[in-house]
Amino acid sequence: MKNQLRGPPVRAHMSTSGAAAAAAAGGTRAGSEPGAGSGSGAGIGAGATTGAGAMPCKSAEWLQEELEARGGASLLLLDCRPHELFESSHIETAINLAIPGLMLRRLRKGNLPIRSIIPNHADKERFATRCKAATVLLYDEATAEWQPEPGAPASVLGLLLQKLRDDGCQAYYLQGGFNKFQTEYSEHCETNVDSSSSPSGSPPTSVLGLGGLRISSDCSDGESDRELPSSATESDGSPVPSSQPAFPVQILPYLYLGCAKDSTNLDVLGKYGIKYILNVTPNLPNAFEHGGEFTYKQIPISDHWSQNLSQFFPEAISFIDEARSKKCGVLVHCLAGISRSVTVTVAYLMQKMNLSLNDAYDFVKRKKSNISPNFNFMGQLLDFERTLGLSSPCDNHAPSEQLYFSTPTNHNLFPINTLEST
């Protein structure tokens, strides 16, 4: 059970330049445009740019005054940090923006509405009704001063800010980000205390958040977009994280996600009641295939950008459902348990739980933190999402876009609580 705590007021001494910016910001209210400040400080503070070409920002002091004077009623706060950091602590009333890395290019091209990357339905509606009427303030972890450089990759914070302003919103970024605001005004920050959180007390990291990601304009196959340790690799080229769970991870009561080692451990298979094994590799043997105790299915796919894994989604989903109907556990594995088997597992959750790609991916990642499907597989999952009709209604796509998989049947959709209690 999570309890929301508000920290005691904490004040930190500001630098001379920071104090000047805050002082200039003090008289600038929500909705003011760049340069709207008064006196000698105009053009420096929260409602103004910090120089030619700089993006418009608001100060921590300005935000504190808005929250205390109006309770944030005239403000729409957007937190662009990873979801785990948002869950750990965030500014009151903020909405978190979380998105799989594959969607960043779509965001850059302008065909991904911002509303569609807000996971919570109530927050979607709040964004839709207030984004044009309120001052929109975005923040990341610690951006202090930001001036775009010509030709440099746009940060996601900058991309969102520019898109909002192009759409007619009064949008700004928070100078100094969350770190500065929490240091100076912790009473306006909400912290979730959860006994199951990181034992070290440090916030976990995520590959899904927007804050530190950058978007390249190249047309690479996506392999370079995977940020994994380089100390080890799969036999067919996929990086393998240095630390992995010792046993398969339970995704649903009957569905387990693991690696090749798990599939050869009789003690593990027996412990979890696993009788069905889905092997998502072209060359790893089915260790106990001839013993008659286990039911196998093998999907001959390598972890490579050229492979079409999505054509096997229907039969993989059917195989998992067969195990479920017989009240048996099913293990989905590849070599390392981070790419191919994850892709199949996410596809299953999307169809059977009626989850969007973003929600299904997040669901799996919360159970197994080291997942990293290759970029092409994520693209296939995105196409699968469209076929299932799970995309946001405001996320329109050109009719000429190609789908790269056999269309699965869209039936037998189960609510989350039904599947998790089975």
From Swiss-Prot:
GO terms for molecular function: MAP kinase tyrosine/serine/threonine phosphatase activity; protein serine/threonine phosphatase activity; protein tyrosine phosphatase activity. Its main location: cytoplasm. Residues 1-43, 219-243 are annotated as: Disordered. Residues 18-33 have a biased composition (Low complexity). It comes from the Eukaryota. Substrate binds at C334, L335, A336, G337, I338, S339, R340. It catalyses: O-phospho-L-tyrosyl-[protein] + H2O = L-tyrosyl-[protein] + phosphate; O-phospho-L-seryl-[protein] + H2O = L-seryl-[protein] + phosphate; O-phospho-L-threonyl-[protein] + H2O = L-threonyl-[protein] + phosphate. The keyword Hydrolase applies. Its EC number is 3.1.3.16, 3.1.3.48. Residues 34-43 have a biased composition (Gly residues). Residues 71-190 form the Rhodanese domain. The active site is at C334 (phosphocysteine intermediate). Dual specificity protein phosphatase. Shows high activity towards MAPK1/ERK2. Also has lower activity towards MAPK14 and MAPK8. In arrested oocytes, plays a role in meiotic resumption. Promotes nuclear envelope breakdown and activation of the CDK1/Cyclin-B complex in oocytes, probably by dephosphorylating and inactivating the conventional protein kinase C (cPKC) isozyme PRKCB. May also inactivate PRKCA and/or PRKCG. This is Dual specificity protein phosphatase 7. It comes from Mus musculus (Mouse).
